[in-house]
């Protein structure tokens, strides 16, 4: 239905002054016209605060032609509209037959029975919650007041500032259009403003005379347009450091689905972060373009909901789209201190939390990958309404444990598994950031498994992804692990040495990896581990391995008040390596646990596949020169058998050592064939020396008699 409302103001002139007595309303609904005359007094009663004087001033019908011409000349006009033929995707899928229709304003327990029940949310109540705030969409300030009529309405917005308040960006949006406004205050105090408007052409706001959209539109395709609103002076100023590729910006905004577009923006933010864009944002084209794209990501979700009219929006689509927005909201908050108002539905959050309450978290890892991801997205979206006793950490840990048990040793994560674990990681991040978790053992297991997955090959794969700008650099278990030994030099030694990779890109990737770690350092802190209180100097901690009943703290000094102290004392170890088991979370009474114990060696490691005698133990490998390599947590007989039947132990490398960490706090070195091979090598060397010496003596004797 298309509704066209035209208000005609009838002015009665009395004694040289204008007064408003009535409003004539013309309605044209799908070709059927109706006319109404409403007395002004009745309209004022229905709409209190409506000022005829303000309407008169806003209309500015008495503006002379010279002023209008001057206003027109000030506003920037595009050299021409770029017409592009673009395919617009069908974003929201059709609702399956029999889906339960849920009103966002009337969510109650039992409205949906479980994850397997198809459901959708009614569009109108949902849209109302997403655009709940009332604010000024089109301000009465220049240059906007030259082009638009002032507009206050229901809206949402994304706002951030850089360099104090000297540079601001606000992306204000309704379900119909988005206006992204850049505002910069120069050192001289001059203010420059530029706005980009995106939306369906027919839904863009009305313009003041004498403006028309063709002169302001930069790009157009089918239903959508991208418009620039600024003055020639302001445009010239912004053009010094902001030269966006409007064709690419517009094409992506039109052709990508809401969820995929949000993921694209998230990937851009990670790459910006690699370059130090969070710590010291540069006012350049890339940063400013990304700001606009962040607001487009939020707009596309709200716009898609609004486009369904009085329909119903599939719950799985909502879970996926709002998960992406939640992740995006978190990273721009951490990176730029950005504020997001609106684009949040308490009804959706409540429904997601209720659905998760029907799931047995400890069994989440047994579901199909599709259901795991759906549940974890719901967990993230519903987190604000779930409460601290929801057990969501247990669900994320169950999924990670399932992935770990079937993951090949020392292999980087494959694409599907990386995506699933990325979704689950956000539940963990939420509880870590809020410091409210009641899931200590599950959280410790989650971080232990993440540490075990943070192998050299995994690190190499992530560095490759960061260097090439692919999604494999977006997430790694390393970011939530308990590894604190990853320095720049160490990461460079783990980086892939490929001819196709530019070394400068690899170096930037290493910086980006470290940037991710520093950004998440608070999240990766060990505050929730009971053994945390036994550590006096966190900067000396290299790794933490929390097993059942005992937590091993690996450090570069002896200042850990553990139950015992072991030292990895080998000839070529470039830096000290101490292992401090903290049994039953009890710190030693003294300053440290005493003199280091010698690590006993197992010469013949028993290879058994009949029972899991090593379940609950951990294996830690280290290089005498490079330090810690990786750890493996033995969770099941399958993992144990995989270790024993594979090339896990590289005993040919005499500089790599393997330590077995047990649940009673004992540390043993698995020498395997190391000592035997060393003796063989030594015997061969001695035999060669003896043989050479014999030849030499024979030569001397022969020469003596000659």
Swiss-Prot record:
One of its GO terms (cellular component) is membrane. Interacts with glycoprotein L (gL); this interaction is necessary for the correct processing and cell surface expression of gH. The heterodimer gH/gL seems to interact with gB trimers during fusion. The heterodimer gH/gL interacts with host EPHA2 to facilitate virus internalization and fusion. Interacts with glycoprotein 42/BZLF2. The gene is gH. The keyword Signal applies. Its main location: virion. Residues 1-18 form the signal peptide. Gene3D superfamilies: Herpesvirus glycoprotein H, C-terminal domain, Herpesvirus glycoprotein H, domain D-II. Residues 165-229 are annotated as: Interaction with gL. This is Envelope glycoprotein H.
